[in-house]
Amino acid sequence: MDRQFELTITHAKQFERFFGWPVLVIFLISFIVMLRTQATWVIPVMLVVSIGMAYKGYMEYRVIRPFAEHQNVVRVLRYRLVDCWISAVSLFVLFIPMYVNEDAFILIGGIVALWGLTRSYREKKWEERIHAHQSELPTYEEVLEGGENIWNYHQK
């Protein structure tokens, strides 16, 4: 296995363990506390959560990119990365107007909700594009769980 790819897989596994459930619990508790007390300390917490989401999307791109054999698959992987970044930024931006202007919060909340509602449609279309060019592309989870077996299969 390529040494750089092996380090990327190891780093992605460590990030998943660190950033998975603990941050989700912190996010939910912070959100509930913020709604009850109007605490402004939630904005930096949401910044950390959104940076983590964007970094996770970047790690998914770095892990899956070596398996892409067609340029159109790489393009779709980049679209998915940009989509992840937009989701992360919109999650952070949603919380700032809550303290400044409630009307802006409602407007931005509606935009974020529409973006979230169309996520499954976008994912389905991206999967169709990927399978049209390369049907055997492994998923992020398969690569993290399979490790060297997936890499060896890809090299054959």
What are these regions (language model features)?
Residues 52-60, 75-98, 111-116, 150:
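Hydrophobic alpha-helical membrane segments
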